[in-house]
Amino acid sequence: MRLTKFTDLALRSLMRLAVVRDGDEPLATREVAEVVGVPYTHAAKAITRLQHLGVVEARRGRGGGLTLTDLGRRVSVGWLVRELEGEAEVVDCEGDNPCPLRGACRLRRALRDAQEAFYAALDPLTVTDLVAAPTGPVLLGLTDRPSG
């Protein structure tokens, strides 16, 4: 299975937000974009989607920035990926040139099952799990600002 670049970006953004230490200022979207190595506009779209899912909170103004919500810390990565990827199937059997086998195709069902197995493998994981050592310290090292 292959994730879209958007889902990859959203997950990496969440992972960076998950390692903010006590006393650190919340990160701005621009900082998240720099850390994960994408243009600001791409990061902003991903952050907006994560806000709509309720896993990121954004506050404007002085003392503002991005924070991971409680839901964001405990939600399943499988659920996040399903939400970010949407209803897309592994193969597009309908599209502009519909497959003549689509009504009786066993491959389509097998690919759907494989896709669900992929998501199910991510279900036991949370974003907090993803940033356990050695990942968390590496993420913290990508930000060039002092703690506190």
Swiss-Prot record:
Keyword Nucleotide-binding tagged: no
Keywords, alphabetical: 2Fe-2S, DNA-binding, Iron, Iron-sulfur, Metal-binding, Transcription, Transcription regulation
Protein origin, superkingdom: Bacteria
InterPro entries, A to Z: Tscrpt_reg_Rrf2, WH-like_DNA-bd_sf, WH_DNA-bd_sf
Cross-referenced SUPFAM superfamilies: Winged helix' DNA-binding domain (SSF46785)
DNA-binding region(s), residue ranges: 29-52
Domain spans labelled HTH rrf2-type: 2-132
Record-given protein name: HTH-type transcriptional repressor NsrR
